[in-house]
Amino acid sequence: MKRILSLLLAIVCCHGIPAQTIDLGRTEPLSPYVFGHNLEHTRGAISGGLSAQMLLNRKFAGKPSRNGGVAADWEGIGDKVFFTLGAPAYTKHICLPNMRRRNELNSQTVQNLVDGQTAGILQKGLYLSEGCEYILRTVTRTSAPVTLTVSLTDRSGEKVYAVHTLSLAPSEDWAENEFRMTPAGSDDEASVRYTFTQRAELTIGALSMMPSENFHGMRPDVVACLKEIGPRLIRWPGGNFAGEYRWKDGLLPVDMRGPQQSASEIHTHPFTHGYDYHEIDTDSFIALCREVGAEPMLTVNMAWNSPEESAQWVEYCNGPADSEYGRIRASRGHEEPYGVRFWCIGNEMGYGHMEGPNGAEGYATLARKHVDAMLEKDLQLDLFSSGPYPNDTWAGKSAAVLADKVKYVSLHHYADAGKHFTDPESTKASYVAITESFTSFVERAERMRRSLDATGEKLHISFDEWNQWYSWFRPSSVAEGIFVARSLHFFMTRSNDLDMPIVCYFQPVAEGAIIITPKGCRLSANGQVYALMKAHQDGRLCKIGDNDDYSTVATRKDKELTITLINHSYDQSREFSFLLKGKVREAVLYSSEEVAPHSFFGSSPLEVTATRKNISTVLPPHSVALLKVDLNF
């Protein structure tokens, strides 16, 4: 008999689940960008997250303390000392003078009114590691000669771990000093103190402290965790923060870049008093993408950037070294163009919380100006429009209007479910609600597809924000890990028929997939699922029958078959049986006894029963598994 090229694998599942088939001969491409992520400068993702910067409010943004004159996160030292916050500022902005923001550009002034008195400022709550070398920088100017003492101490100041002194001469110019300190002890609640005893007025423009071991100002351990989850696309700098971001400020030295105030500061920057301190610029973001193997996706500040400024950003990234902004890039050590292909024209325009036009027609009119200017610099861009999708009005009056040049339309959605874990009944109900809430993504994506198709234009869906709502304000759990697994299975399974090649999780760093403390970081249950499922990347997606619950995904790379399985049941095991001629090369189980917050998956070998033509396994409740099968055996 002629060999049948289309080999079928039967998967038989218990508990009434119908038999499934995996068709190895009928495969289709799997977009690598289904494994996309966001990196937005919000909440704890940068400050206290990816950034290696240890000092809070190091550029003294915002208002001073009541009757004290000291910037937030700092304390004054000395009894008869006069503290003021304001001009003259060392930090600055290059452009966007029309942006309505306040209190971004300050310096901290310390007037010591009594000669011989110790005056200065301190910050508490730092984590010091014995023997670790730290790089510190000060930007100051003074009215009289000053000996500035920088001390690393315990919280009270009684125990001193390291000291460095600087001799500062009076000048109207800013003095920039960099030095290194290595503490003689470890401390979870250390302080850094900047003091002097001379009667003088010392103005501090910026301060900095970070471990000397860093990756472009980022924590290497966090970068390693990000690499572990396998992002193939990273969207930056937002999200909502795209409406605050001044890309040209990134051309300034990092200490000189003005803080950036958020329009919706309580939501986006609640832990940093409404400000971002611009620790990561375009060059460092591109370096991060290259380190972790991701394509960059940039979002322009459509509300406050002019079309020309958006085009200049494109030229900075993609222009030849002899172009105006390509020359600037080359002067910063990056001769070759970055080749940034993906560009979002604003974020969530039309929802009301973003500044700029909030109507479909007004957005389309302004977006067209940015698009035309950007394409003059690079015709090969893939552009993304935004709006309150799915929305038929916006589809017709915005997405369709821009469709000749903008082929992708952004879709954002956050699932929500009650979370109560204090008794067995509420724990089970919450688990079921969380793990089933991924179906809202199915409904939204299908509605979006119908809405875009109704315009008659060929438009792709970019589902570039998704997660559980407010996941960034609470600890993760195995329940959310199963939710992420089911969501990823849906996105992989339906990416082609919904024409949805781009999907970006929001967001991994300190807000879902990577848990970060001053001492270290680790993957959450969500991150563990991503690390497991990245095995599907670069494979071809196999067609699977009777897979309505998205329990199974299979991809093929030549003679290797990768299968991931999900048992989303709260309290029932699930059996999978494969009629398959092959050898199991790898079988891993991610399981846990707990599903409540603070729970993680444990990794163990998956028990597999193999005969000549059959492979079977049983997954315990709320678990995920990976099998790799050698089809050439």
Per-region residue spans from a language model:
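Active-site groove signature of glycoside hydrolases
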Residues: 324-358, 413-415, 459-467
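Carbohydrate-binding surface patches
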Residues: 548-582, 591, 622-628
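Aromatic/acidic polysaccharide-binding cleft in carbohydrate-active enzymes
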Residues: 41-42, 460-552
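Extracellular and organelle-lumenal recognition/adhesion modules and their flexible linkers in secreted
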Residues: 20-278, 295, 311, 361, ...
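The substrate-binding groove and active-site-proximal loops of carbohydrate-active enzymes
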Residues: 208-216, 263-278, 298-304, 346-364, ...
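An active-site-proximal structural segment forming one wall of the substrate-binding cleft
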Residues: 211-231, 285, 306-342, 367-376, ...
